[in-house]
């Protein structure tokens, strides 16, 4: 075999053509072909990453979150929000077809395959940021509302836990008898339409954008997200939120509201939990209020010593104790897959996008609720 002495010569390049062809070495070697359109996607992804870092929060908040993104939200919901088929199925089908075509092009060489693969990643990254991801650059809800976590101490958390406990007792007492049975706790039908108006009203109360009709789907199979310690996820490339079908009915109101808040452009996890709490608290539906109160109580309980929580649980009405038991039993059906890896990766992702607390940001909701109620202690807010 003749050795390759240098990398030479022939370069045909035009962004109006499908491919760029390099001839490497002698004429006996196969030309290296690069997929041109993939270079465009790669460049767009790099540009998105750069401008995300260099432009200030005031820009993203005004021009993207309250401007460009609102237009995207309205257009998407008008065109695709009424589809009975979750967009995740359609997007995954497109990815599978594109992957099959990519494998079928292996005869064009490794340069081509790698350029196509990187182009695919670039397309997903670009769509992520331009369709939603730039919301990570917005001014945080905590800053909008003037919250300061340093102003909340241990005694405040204890008082908030007691308040959340009292609310849970009250909401459970207000349930109709048929909603206190196991079949309701586990299998009552709860869908995104049941929460949308509550979420929009909560956002309006906070003077935040709320146009559009965000969908939150419950795709098959049960447990797919729960096995990754995740109850729900918003996927920007689909324009829709998703919750695990394996969740109990009592867990769904808060989780749907959380993912719907993401769909309206809120990126911070603690802020989405706060909006979910507010939406459920002010709902006219007793099941939504009860489900929201239970989920929020669990967040508050996570901030307390075990003995304090254990002592409280035994004083709850039967429906609350039964709901807590059923949730724990349901969690055991879906054991975590690589929990440490998942936590490390996701926490790193959140911090990379400006969420300083990482996974701990979810529990910021307790501090946010405590400070919100203190600022609005005139009785006009939900207790």
Regions found by a protein language model. Give the residues of each.
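Membrane-interface segments at or immediately adjacent to transmembrane helices
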Residues: 134-204
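Post-HExxH zinc-binding segment in Zn-dependent metallohydrolases
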Residues: 164, 267-310
């Amino acid at each position: 075999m003749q050795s390759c002495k240098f990398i030479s010569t022939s370069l045909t390049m035009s962004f109006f053509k499908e491919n760029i062809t390099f001839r490497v070495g002698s004429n006996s070697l196969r030309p290296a072909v690069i997929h041109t359109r993939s270079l465009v996607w790669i460049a767009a992804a790099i540009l998105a990453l750069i401008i995300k870092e260099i432009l200030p929060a005031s820009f993203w908040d005004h021009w993207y979150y309250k401007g460009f993104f609102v237009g995207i939200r309205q257009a998407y919901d008008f065109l695709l929000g009424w589809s009975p088929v979750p967009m995740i199925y359609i997007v995954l089908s497109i990815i599978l077809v594109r992957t099959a075509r990519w494998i079928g092009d292996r005869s064009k060489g490794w340069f081509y395959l790698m350029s196509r693969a990187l182009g695919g990643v670039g397309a997903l990254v670009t769509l992520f940021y331009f369709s939603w991801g730039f919301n990570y650059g917005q001014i945080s809800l905590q800053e909008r509302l003037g919250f300061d976590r340093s102003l909340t101490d241990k005694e405040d958390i204890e008082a908030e836990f007691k308040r959340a406990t009292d609310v849970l007792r009250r909401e459970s007492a207000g349930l109709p008898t048929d909603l206190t049975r196991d079949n309701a706790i586990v299998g009552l039908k709860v869908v995104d339409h049941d929460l949308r108006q509550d979420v929009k009203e909560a956002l309006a109360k906070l003077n935040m954008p709320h146009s559009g009709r965000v969908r939150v789907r419950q795709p098959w199979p049960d447990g797919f997200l729960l096995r990754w310690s995740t109850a729900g996820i918003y996927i920007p490339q689909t324009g829709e939120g998703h919750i695990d079908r394996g969740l109990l009915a009592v867990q769904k109101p808060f989780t749907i509201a959380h993912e719907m808040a993401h769909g309206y452009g809120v990126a911070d996890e603690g802020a989405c939990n706060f909006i979910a709490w507010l939406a459920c608290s002010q709902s006219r539906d007793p099941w939504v209020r009860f489900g929201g109160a239970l989920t929020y109580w669990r967040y508050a309980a996570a901030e307390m010593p075990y003995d304090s929580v254990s002592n409280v649980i035994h004083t709850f009405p039967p429906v609350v104790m039964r709901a807590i038991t059923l949730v724990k039993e349901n969690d055991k059906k879906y054991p975590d897959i690589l929990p440490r890896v998942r936590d490390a990766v996701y926490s790193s992702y959140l911090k990379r996008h400006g969420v300083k607390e990482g996974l701990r940001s979810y529990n910021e909701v307790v501090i946010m609720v405590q400070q919100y109620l203190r600022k609005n202690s005139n009785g006009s807010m939900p207790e």
